[in-house]
């Protein structure tokens, strides 16, 4: 476009697209509508990828996990007000889990919104977003688009990663500027996530504590997986001989079948250890805040490696805090521990005996006949376990209560950043969004193991998966209920609040053009899984399991408050 003086012009749409591209963003996930529909169209016209979802929350979850896998911000695009609010849930999820993400939302006109005159989808979105992310920006001028996007990228990935909100008022897109000036304004931040080198005395203190430990363990969190310094972490573990425990999304950072893995005896390892080395893991509710019977009677000493200084001492005193990026910290710690004796053989031997015993028990459960003759979690997930061991490049998405807990315990992972689950909040609804992003980012097949209740939060995105013909196989653990499917009704004519229809989810997939299967036995599940993944097409396996399978609230039943007085 040119003006009367023959100066070539560009507009807000094009400058925003150019700014995103300059910052290596080539994919967006979102839901189109006023005022951003044409932005999505023009993004596609420019040759970039746009995955159009049925609900903004799931588009946001896709962006969040894309950020985790790739180590750069995943980008979600939404409409204003209600659509923006749907996206904020996933923005908060990204921030809580330390995933780099940028939420871009169109918004109504500032001069009307600020006077609360009732504009279309009126909302002060920038300030609504602020408590739920690392930073919240609004771009009012076309000239500020390049610096606004660059700041969002740097903020999302620097230090502890997280979500960033960028507000895009509708009038911004129609503003114009000369192409020459726009090109001068475009830039990419230099070294947006610089190494943060830990202090020498912090490394020395941590090394001394580890050298003097009698029963050390290493706890690997998803922060360690995000750091993508897999070889350094593996070398630290193997050079020290210290047993390790992976949190859910750290499974596969070292293979779950590694001889130093103590995952099969986690409770014993935590209760008996005297020093715990936390690498990219937080002492939050997932680790019982470092206290209680989980951690035994003996006072523990902690080494904690984290890029955020105020994470230290958040629940327990940290004897050796190491503030810095994980790659730098682990590298320096290896040097400080060079030549030190390996972990005590009596301690590692005791753990190995426990691991071997527990693995034998689990193997028996995976092959045992059930009293009802129906599948349960053990024998059905045993099929998934064997398949994943033979196909370690597949991404495994997992959510639910019992479906989450049992899959994490039973299905071994051999490669990093392949297990994608509910994360720090234990949130339901991440499933189908994660599937879309994992397939888009890796270009490889994805398997999702879903509780039937959890699947309900994002099930309509089956249409999205089919529309883009993604190689996703969804397995629904169908016991017909939240937790269980056989809770008695409280009274005649009143359906239990935990009951679900034991439905034909396979037919949902077929309604959108995918392939559906019903599996009633492990053999049927195995055959369906092999055929589905080999097809490279969208597939869903309706795995019918015993309604009595499962326990209320999975392994966190203690968090479910019960009445002290009972029924009146």
From Swiss-Prot:
Effect of residue 483 to F: 2-fold reduction in the affinity binding and strong reduction in the catalytic efficiency for oxalyl-CoA
Entry keyword annotation includes Nucleotide-binding: yes
Pathway: Metabolic intermediate degradation; oxalate degradation; CO(2) and formate from oxalate: step 2/2
Membrane-spanning intervals of the chain: none
Binding site for substrate: 34, 120, 263-267, 358, 408-409, 553-555
Enzyme class, UniProt record, top EC level: lyase
Quaternary structure note: Homotetramer; dimer of dimers.
Free-text function comment from the UniProt entry: Involved in the catabolism of oxalate and in the adapatation to low pH via the induction of the oxalate-dependent acid tolerance response (ATR). Essential enzyme for the bacterium survival, as it relies on oxalic acid as its sole source of energy. Catalyzes the decarboxylation of oxalyl-CoA to yield carbon dioxide and formyl-CoA.
The protein's name in its UniProt record: Oxalyl-CoA decarboxylase
Gene source species: Oxalobacter formigenes
Lineage per the UniProt record: Bacteria, Pseudomonadati, Pseudomonadota, Betaproteobacteria, Burkholderiales
